[in-house]
Amino acid sequence: DKIIATPHYHPEFKYLKGEELNKVCEEFKKQLKENNIDIEIYLGNEIYFTYDLIEKISELDFYCLNKSKYILIEFPPTNFPLNLCNIVYELKQKGFIPVLAHVERYIKIHDDPEIIYDCIKTGAIIQINSSSLIGKQGKEIQRFCNLLIERNMVHLVATDAHGSQRRRPMMKDAYQYIEKKYSKEIADNLFINNAQCILDNKEIIIEEPFEKSMEKVSFLKRIFRR
């Protein structure tokens, strides 16, 4: 088994960063080996987007995914950037491939799913969470995940795990869900092949996304604002 550990990174918060984070990761890998736990750990960060990120990115001590050109980014849910495609473009110009984390969680994207289409055409990779896919975040979010998958707008499924109890991994259930609902080929691409491309720092070959007939799930506004 292989895991890319992606602890949060915010330039203004006191998370573990840089070499200090790398030392913790190396110690964790050592403990796994000493306890005969056959899991390979790779280091990355989930970078919290701030509006000066592009300007300061060369000064920040975050980790791309396994030292690749792929950079995992999440966005503020209540202050979602209006110019997301421009952000993707600017990151590409700086040599990164942005992986947009858990896009199914953003109300703005539910209101206008074609944002995802435009971002993919600009060069972004799209990730959703396993828990969302199998309905643990509600049927409407699950439905939206399926809409994206059916339109070739998802490239990765990840855990968003924060522990063994809170936000625990649900990858096996999610893989089986995709295999049964769609196909083994699609499941392998979303869970294995595309992730391996990131580990190997290779290009992810994506299917052409469908722009038309994207449904808007306005019901989510009521869910998130309760």
Spans of model-derived segments:
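Mid-to-C-terminal alpha-helical segments outside catalytic/metal-binding sites
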Residues: 176-226
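Histidine/acidic-residue-rich catalytic or RNA/ligand-binding cores of hydrolases
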Residues: 110-117, 137-146, 150-151, 164-176, ...
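Conserved short secondary-structure transition element at the edge of the structured enzyme core
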Residues: 128, 145-159
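Short acidic, glycine/proline-enriched helix-loop-strand junctions
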Residues: 15-19, 36-40, 166-193
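Extended substrate/RNA-proximal surfaces in nucleic-acid metabolism proteins
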Residues: 14-127, 205-226
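Active-site environment of divalent metal-dependent phosphoester hydrolases
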Residues: 10-13, 48-50, 105-109, 133-136, ...
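Short beta-strand segments at enzyme active-site cores
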Residues: 1-8, 41-44
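Short acidic/histidine-rich active-site segments
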Residues: 6-8, 153-169
